[in-house]
From Swiss-Prot:
SUPFAM superfamilies: L9 N-domain-like (SSF55658), Ribosomal protein L9 C-domain (SSF55653). Keywords: Ribonucleoprotein, Ribosomal protein, RNA-binding, rRNA-binding. GO terms for molecular function: rRNA binding; structural constituent of ribosome. One of its GO terms (biological process) is translation. Binds to the 23S rRNA. Disulfide bonds: none annotated. Pfam families: Ribosomal_L9_C, Ribosomal_L9_N. PANTHER family: 50S RIBOSOMAL PROTEIN L9 (PTHR21368). Belongs to the bacterial ribosomal protein bL9 family. It comes from Burkholderia multivorans (strain ATCC 17616 / 249). This is Large ribosomal subunit protein bL9.
Length: 150
């Protein structure tokens, strides 16, 4: 299916690009989330009329993400979990736990924005986690997992 992108999409293209994607990806993700529209003649003409407005909105989102990223980058957060004497956690710290921790600290972060390269945290200690605030703004934070011996 040919679509026109209404915002920058990672690994796909930038605002205004006309790209070919699988039908399911377009119907189930891109179009419902208002990231794209079918690339019909009418849609392309309407996009060209609204292009400046969409570019302005995209620039505002990027600026807001960069401002939050400057505050968040390099910060360290602590979370306490039950653990055994050997330092292994009972359960794990997931991206949802990290997103909740960041929300309590005053940052508006969704769990889908938290990237954990090694998967959920299962040991006590300091761990690096990435937060993707925007497709162009990815910041690193440190999560210090403190063990609460049961």
């Amino acid at each position: 299916m040919q679509i026109i992108l209404l915002e920058k999409v990672a690994n796909l293209g930038n605002l205004g690009d006309i790209v070919k994607v699988k039908d399911g990806y377009a119907r189930n993700f891109l179009i419902p989330n208002r990231k794209a529209r079918r690339a019909t003649k009418e849609a392309i003409a309407e996009f060209e009329v609204r292009r400046a407005e969409l570019e302005k909105i995209a620039a505002e989102k990027l600026a807001a993400s960069q401002a939050v990223g400057e505050k968040l980058n390099g910060q360290s957060f602590e979370i306490t979990q039950k653990s055994g004497v050997d330092g292994r956690l009972f359960g794990s710290v997931t991206n949802a736990d990290v997103a909740e921790l960041l929300k309590k600290a005053g940052f508006d972060v969704e769990k889908s924005q938290v990237r954990m390269p090694e998967g959920p945290l299962k040991m006590i200690g300091e761990h690096g986690v990435q937060v993707a605030l925007h497709t162009d703004v990815v910041v690193d934070v440190t999560i210090n997992v403190i063990g609460d011996h049961a």
